[in-house]
Amino acid sequence: MNASSSETLEVVDDRFQKDRSWTVAWIAGLIVVGMVLVLAGMGRRFWCECGSWVPWSWDIWTAHNSQHLIDPYFFSHVLHGVLFYWALRWVPRLNRTQCLLIALGLEASWEILENSPLIIERYREATMAVGYTGDSIANSVTDVAACMLGYWFSSRFPWRWSVALFVVSEILMLIMIRDNLLLNVLMLVSPIPAIQEWQSG
């Protein structure tokens, strides 16, 4: 193969990579837009009713929780991305792009399910979130972004870093708000009254 042919192949390969990147970006965008439209159709409001445009809210016991861009549960969604990356990595015949889009689709689907009346009521009955009314659309979009951040982190650093991120995040959340991803799942699936009492204390 001469130099001219080699350069031509490189140009074609670069163009293919760019086209594929744009395709992935379009699909990812459609997933997020689709989630937003579904949430809007479910009657979810875009932002906190309080009218304050402060992008964060750190007090989980107020009506601001899950209504702004960032709250303490942002870090749980980062861990979603960590878990999705390592779970999907071992699924046969899936390439990196497919794994990424599946992770994005799973997180978007969870945001829709989480804001359904069934799950909202379950949160109110079984967890410390007795006043939970669902997420704002803006918060759901940020949660998806947090998931992608965790996914990116796990894809770029050795597995030990993912473990460290998971453990440190869970411990810090437990100290700060008496809740974390593992406790949240446990209380949703099989509530333990003693834990609920401790969380509310």
Curated annotation (Swiss-Prot):
The keyword Kinase does not apply. It is a multi-pass membrane protein. It holds the Pfam family DUF2585. The chain crosses the membrane at residues 22-42, 68-88, 157-177. One of its GO terms (cellular component) is plasma membrane. Keywords: Cell membrane, Membrane, Transmembrane, Transmembrane helix. InterPro entries: DUF2585. It is found in: Cell membrane. Belongs to the UPF0314 family. This is UPF0314 protein RB9128. It comes from Rhodopirellula baltica (strain DSM 10527 / NCIMB 13988 / SH1).
